[in-house]
């Protein structure tokens, strides 16, 4: 058999071509002829986003699982799409307008929406093509966008259903204003950062000579004060309760009230109450029925409710100006440095302003109760299990969800108001088109819905709901969700709530939370720190398979992933190993006949058994989302068993003069190569598909082949154990040569002394050619005189090697004594830790286990070095 020769491993030369081949041959489409179903939806990336390492990790782990399920003959659907990302996309568009000297105010609403759609169309290809570079095998024909017509239909239906159930309402509440976008954001979209601020001690005068001193971090909000609150038990202020004070720099008077919320020990013990701009003050105002004064515009500027000289200023600029005037006019008693936690919008980075506004909300508790029960009943599982606590915490402490956003980009709220009567109608279309509303005029609510309001419907809206068509029936509920920990509440919990409310089922059974990416210093990777790694740089340098295998191999369930760019060399070396080993086999096909009737010897049976074990290990690992274990199984099989042992041993028969023996050897190598490519394919699909295409039939695609199954007929436990014994001997001689710095190429005499009950003596003698190939010996002796040889004990036999003439005995003894002392000291240190009850009780479980392994390792090394020393002294 002859095939096209592989050149050097150059992923740039074939990865794009392979991906196109998969698309052309509909590899990623589900197969409805298969009985068992596997479906999964991908977290939709922002349509204007670019690929980062978090995306890469998430999509790689999804794709590895999807490819495995597809090859295991599941009817597999992986649904992908992009998110319209309201605030983020509109911000990108407004930055674009600024560059060309325009603003959003230059457009009518519909014109603006159309312009943003054009931007979306230009950007969508960027993130999608980048995800394709990873080898993502999602169904391209079913790609969705959260503003697609059917998804809009689903959003409107959900809004209406919740409204008529009394679970959506409109009310005036304190919300979180992002001044950058002019929109409100939810509590969960806020990141708190410690900032260096000031604590201002301000005088609120009762009359010309007496005043009450108030401590505040935000003097600019005093124009929204409607009371001063003190603790009822604070003796200092009891006589002032009920009296009026004047807000500094104004003539406005407000009352002193008593409320137990006030902490007498903080500041001066007197609290300015600003209900429209502080959540705690808002609650105080409700208890005391006092007014609320909003001093901000929607873009975070001071409004007409403040003195004229401050109107139009940002809060920060106003604070500086007010501080100066307070000082000049004698209202400022003191200013102290003060560290404080300040909320920032996680999307825009802007400081959040508490803001009194009329908004739309979802009552969440009735939905959350059902979602909690789903976890308790076992309908939903998290991997790792620890993330169940995060899920439970959010749902147990849930607040109503503010779903309205002051944007033009997104799902328009399906609510209309009668221009003349303010009557409210919930409808997809203009109610004036209805005959019963003839002559009435309506305007639609100007706000759009929070981006997450469409995202929480993703598992079923992307499958056609509210239409219950073939896709919905076949693939809902989905099997698995793979996502990041930081959107457990934003997305995961909300999807569970929506799924239960609108379909009566959880939208997925398993939730796998990916590791948190950190740099080598343990810092979380983030754009602000600039410590991220661009996955496209890694792909350009090493290829997609290198990125994929490294991320999968290092993804230990429940542990953070500390990584830098150099780590991807690991995946590159493995992909290169696969390529070069395959190249060796394919080169040896030349002028040889491939046999179908394979005769397996004991070494073949050892490898078949190892393959069986690997298949079981991979299956068990994927069942529990242990990617690193699955990766390790295939890595160990291919690199160690297949390459380091089987291929090397096969070279004996490949070099045999008998052509029939050569043909049998290459036929078995090709058989095992195909099995190897199959088990490796989900992890490194590009290089395995490329290699397979070099010897398979033209129309045969590796990705559509069945993943090998455990085969009891290929489980040869006795042959497996026998070869393990032979390996022990070979490894012992190799190790001995290495530890005494004897080059592997140097031939030495070796000897074996078998125990009386050792039953594999004949096997050893029959396989001398393998031993010769693997350790390069001069002569091998059995049960003879071992004087002058260095010995190593093994189970069932003793191993001896003649190294006396190749080493300096005195120097080696000195070296070994130093090594022995080093490992004894290390073992003492580990022993002390393991004897310390505090360490055992308080240290993380993985650290304790690591120390136990060290103790075993050091003890073994001490024993081995001691034996070397004793043997050397007797030479």
From Swiss-Prot:
It catalyses: tRNA(Val) + L-valine + ATP = L-valyl-tRNA(Val) + AMP + diphosphate. A motif ('HIGH' region) lies at residues 45-55. It holds the Pfam family Anticodon_1. Residues 803-837 form a coiled coil. InterPro entries: aa-tRNA-synth_I_CS, aa-tRNA-synth_Ia, Anticodon_Ia_Val, M/V/L/I-tRNA-synth_anticd-bd, Rossmann-like_a/b/a_fold, tRNA-bd_arm, tRNAsynth_Ia_anticodon-bd, Val-tRNA_synth_C_sf. GO terms for cellular component: cytosol. Keywords: Aminoacyl-tRNA synthetase, ATP-binding, Coiled coil, Cytoplasm, Ligase, Nucleotide-binding, Protein biosynthesis. ValRS has two distinct active sites: one for aminoacylation and one for editing. The misactivated threonine is translocated from the active site to the editing site. This is Valine--tRNA ligase. It comes from Borreliella burgdorferi (strain ATCC 35210 / DSM 4680 / CIP 102532 / B31) (Borrelia burgdorferi). The gene is valS.
């Amino acid at each position: 058999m002859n095939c096209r020769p592989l050149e050097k491993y150059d992923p740039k030369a074939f990865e794009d071509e392979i991906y196109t081949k998969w698309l052309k041959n509909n590899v990623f489409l589900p197969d409805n002829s298969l009985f068992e179903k596997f479906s999964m939806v991908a977290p939709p990336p922002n349509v204007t986003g670019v690929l980062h390492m978090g995306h890469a990790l998430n999509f790689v782990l999804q794709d590895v699982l999807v490819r495995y399920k597809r090859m295991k003959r599941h009817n597999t659907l992986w649904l992908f799409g992009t998110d319209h990302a309201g605030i983020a996309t509109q911000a990108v568009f407004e930055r674009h307008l600024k560059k060309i000297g325009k603003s959003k105010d230059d457009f009518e609403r519909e014109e603006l929406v159309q312009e943003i759609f054009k931007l979306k169309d230009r950007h969508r290809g960027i993130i999608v093509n980048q995800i394709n570079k990873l080898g993502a095998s999602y169904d391209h024909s079913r790609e969705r966008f959260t503003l697609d017509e059917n998804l809009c239909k689903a959003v409107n239906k959900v809004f209406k259903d919740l409204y008529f159930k009394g679970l959506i309402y409109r009310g005036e509440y304190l919300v979180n204003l992002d001044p950058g976008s002019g929109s409100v954001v939810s509590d969960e979209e806020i990141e708190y950062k410690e900032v260096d601020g000031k604590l201002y001690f301000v005088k609120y005068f009762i009359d010309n000579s007496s005043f009450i001193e108030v401590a505040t971090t935000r003097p600019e909000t005093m124009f929204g004060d409607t009371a001063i609150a003190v603790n009822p038990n604070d003796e200092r202020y009891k006589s002032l309760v009920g009296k009026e004070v004047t807000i500094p720099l104004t003539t406005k008077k407000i009352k002193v009230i008593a409320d137990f919320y006030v902490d007498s020990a903080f500041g001066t013990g007197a609290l300015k109450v600003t209900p429209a701009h502080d959540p705690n003050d808002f609650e105080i105002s409700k208890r005391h029925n006092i007014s609320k004064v909003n001093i901000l515009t929607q873009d975070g500027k001071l409004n007409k409710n403040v003195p004229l000289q401050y109107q139009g200023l940002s809060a920060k600029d106003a604070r500086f100006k007010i501080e100066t005037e307070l000082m000049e006019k004698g209202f400022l008693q003191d200013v102290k440095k003060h560290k404080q936690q300040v909320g920032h919008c996680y999307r825009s980075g802007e400081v959040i302003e508490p803001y009194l506004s009329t908004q739309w909300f979802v009552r969440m508790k009735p939905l959350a109760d059902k979602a909690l029960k789903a976890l308790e009943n076992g309908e939903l599982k998290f991997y790792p299990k620890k993330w169940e606590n995060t899920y439970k915490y959010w749902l147990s402490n849930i607040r109503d969800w503010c779903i309205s956003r002051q944007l033009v980009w997104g799902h328009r709220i399906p609510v209309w108001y009668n221009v003349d009567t303010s009557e409210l109608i919930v409808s997809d279309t203009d109610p004036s088109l209805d005959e019963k509303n003839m002559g009435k005029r309506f305007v639609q609510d100007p706000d759009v819905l929070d981006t997450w309001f469409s995202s929480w419907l993703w598992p079923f809206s992307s499958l056609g709901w509210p239409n219950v068509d073939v896709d919905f029936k076949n693939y809902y509920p989905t099997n698995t969700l793979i996502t990041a920990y930081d959107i457990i509440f934003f997305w995961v919990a909300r999807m569970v709530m929506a799924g239960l409310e609108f379909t009566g089922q959880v939208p997925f059974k398993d939730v796998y939370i990916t590791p948190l990416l950190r740099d080598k210093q343990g810092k979380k990777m983030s754009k602000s720190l600039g410590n991220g790694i661009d996955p496209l740089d890694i792909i350009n340098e090493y290829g997609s398979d290198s990125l994929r295998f490294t991320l999968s191999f290092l993804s230990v369930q429940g542990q953070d992933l500390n990584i830098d760019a150099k780590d991807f060399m690991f995946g590159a070396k493995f992909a290169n190993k696969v390529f070069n080993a395959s190249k060796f086999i394919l080169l040896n096909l030349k002028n040889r006949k491939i046999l179908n009737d394979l005769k397996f010897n004991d070494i073949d049976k050892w490898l078949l058994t190892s393959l069986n074990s690997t298949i079981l290990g991979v299956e068990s690992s994927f069942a529990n989302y242990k990617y690193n274990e699955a990766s390790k199984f295939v890595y160990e099989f291919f690199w160690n068993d297949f390459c380091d042992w089987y291929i090397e041993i096969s070279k004996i028969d490949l070099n045999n003069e008998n052509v029939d023996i050569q043909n049998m050897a290459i036929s078995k190598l090709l058989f095992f190569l195909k099995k190897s490519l199959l088990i490796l394919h989900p992890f490194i699909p590009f290089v395995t598909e490329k290699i397979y295409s070099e010897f398979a039939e033209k129309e045969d695609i590796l990705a559509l082949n069945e993943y090998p199954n455990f085969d009891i007929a290929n489980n040869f436990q006795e042959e497996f154990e026998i070869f393990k014994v032979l390996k022990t001997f070979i490894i012992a001689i190799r190790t001995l040569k290495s530890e005494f710095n004897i080059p592997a190429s140097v031939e030495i005499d070796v000897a074996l002394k078998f125990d009386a009950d050792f039953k594999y003596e004949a096997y050893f003698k029959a396989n001398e050619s393998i031993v010769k190939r693997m350790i390069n010996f001069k002569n091998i002796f059995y049960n003879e005189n071992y004087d002058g040889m260095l010995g190593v004990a093994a189970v069932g036999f003793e191993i001896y090697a003649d190294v006396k003439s190749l080493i300096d005995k005195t120097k080696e003894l000195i070296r070994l004594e130093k090594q022995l002392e080093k490992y004894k000291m290390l073992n003492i240190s580990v022993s002390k830790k393991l004897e310390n009850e505090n360490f055992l009780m308080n240290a993380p479980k993985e650290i304790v286990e690591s120390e136990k392994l060290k103790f075993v390792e050091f003890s073994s090394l001490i024993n081995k070095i001691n034996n070397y020393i004793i043997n050397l002294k007797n030479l």
